[in-house]
Amino acid sequence: LSMPVLAAPMTGVLYNMGGKLSEDAFIRMIIEGAAAAGTIGMCGDGADPAMYASGVDAIMAQGGCGIPIVKPRAQEAVKEMLARADAAGAAAVGVDVDGAGLLVMALKGQPVSPKSFAELAELVGATKLPFIVKGVMTPDEAVIAFDAGAAAIVVSNHGGRVLDHAPGAAEVLPEIASAVRGRGVILADGGVRTGADVLKYLALGADAVLIGRPLVVGAFGGGAEGVATLLQKLKSELTSAMLLTGTASVRAVSPRILRPAAVR
């Protein structure tokens, strides 16, 4: 990757974004734009099965440069979707376990439910691709994910849309990172708007971050080029922030660059 930033999985263009673009056009812009910027875009899953299909098709068209994220559906349904990601040559695949709280899925006849350790392990074993567990918010959840064989986790509260009063990812990230550092890749999302925000997340323990809503603006305003431009802007801002904090590389980011709340 050219930067520690990936495009987050997003679906629901019609009911979340005004419907000015089709689901297919939107996700192609995200996947193509991310690839043009030297990184990877994720695609999501939703109440309409066509949403996932659009994402997988976009990833296949981009030579596999993308990561599908599946809702926590029934085991056999998830396995079938993992197989489609595998056939598309995807870089990795995952399940957003906090999607179990999305009532719209059940209302649309697409039931979802929490996943146990055994169920996660079964899904990890059902694909040859690196497996990502998205929606981790506590250290014990992170341990379970890695014990089940996940290659990566995403510390995320689903954009604040599944549980009122849940803490932000940045609040819980340090404790989670401390519990599982070295066991796999730690990703995080939520509120990233500038390159300085990216650096903060890295200092809190993330290996890379996901960015979502701003890329909607990029896609609607400038298509794939708009997505790439926004990501490149983040990279430039991150580079500047690293220079100004004496950070030589993303692997050398230190918590020392953060100012403790107690001294503000």
Label each region the model flagged.
Residues 142-145, 150, 201, 206:
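Small-residue (primarily alanine) positions within well-ordered alpha-helices
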Residues 23, 166-169:
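Short, conserved glycine- and acidic-residue-centered signature motifs
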Residues 168-264:
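Alpha/beta catalytic cores of nucleotide-metabolism and tRNA/nucleoside-modifying enzymes
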Residues 110-142, 147-148, 169-181, 185, ...:
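Active-site/ligand-binding-proximal alpha/beta "capping" segment
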Residues 1-143, 147, 159-162:
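Active-site entrance/lid segments in N-terminal catalytic domains of soluble metabolic enzymes
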